[in-house]
């Protein structure tokens, strides 16, 4: 089987997968995407005093402000998740979750930790795609009304979302000389570039979903660590943040790359 035949078979499989799952894939994508906010909101509830004391100690802001911060995080994240899953006021929910990301980036000093900053930006990319999807749903209500060609901010949201999502994979690159690490870096980088430029996008994004899910289950198996150990919370945080990026990639699979992409430009050539 030649290279073109192999690529064609893979694309046929991706198209078949999309046809079979198109009814529920967006719902799974949204659930995966908001999973890190859902988990963090629930954790805020059960670790209220620990989170409050951490903020108070770090910023020396006092009991009241620290408690207000934890409450805002808890309420903002759980409310945003409920709105996204119920498909109500999704755009407002996305803006609220963007605010939570920005707030946590500052409060937990993530701004100075490149790895966690890139993961937060990737999470923001997933929210951009969710925002683009909500705009698309709104426009579908007026399907019979003539509109301008897809020159709205939606296509640029999709582009920005794709570019930000690939930052997640940059945090997974290994800089040792083992064969597996080199192979993983080459394949991962190639797929990242394809998703970013929007070429063979659905196939590349679906491949990244499978690869990232396997890595996530293997390296972030928090359920194998006793709850009382700090590593349990650390791995759980990584696991659900990775699941959110997987949700963003599933939205790319479900919605396509948008107007600013190689796949779209090929149709005009």
Curated annotation (Swiss-Prot):
GO cellular component: endoplasmic reticulum; endoplasmic reticulum membrane; endoplasmic reticulum-Golgi intermediate compartment; endoplasmic reticulum-Golgi intermediate compartment membrane; Golgi membrane
Topological type in the membrane: Multi-pass membrane protein
A Gene Ontology biological process term: Golgi organization
Subcellular location: Endoplasmic reticulum membrane; Endoplasmic reticulum-Golgi intermediate compartment membrane; Golgi apparatus membrane
InterPro entries: Surf1/Surf4, Surf4
UniProt keyword Transport present: yes
Sequence motif Di-lysine motif, residues: 266-269
Keyword Kinase part of the UniProt annotation: no
Top-rank lineage group of the source organism: Eukaryota
Signal sequence extent: none
Keywords in alphabetical order: Endoplasmic reticulum, Golgi apparatus, Membrane, Protein transport, Transmembrane, Transmembrane helix, Transport
Pfam family name, one: SURF4
One GO molecular-function entry: cargo receptor activity
Similarity annotation: Belongs to the SURF4 family.
Subunit structure: Found in a complex composed at least of SURF4, TMED2 and TMED10. May interact with LMAN1. Interacts with ZFYVE27 and with KIF5A in a ZFYVE27-dependent manner. Interacts with STING1. Interacts with SAR1B. Interacts with TMEM41B.
Domains: entry comment: The di-lysine motif confers endoplasmic reticulum localization for type I membrane proteins.
Protein's UniProt name: Surfeit locus protein 4
Species this protein is from: Bos taurus (Bovine)
Gene behind the chain: SURF4
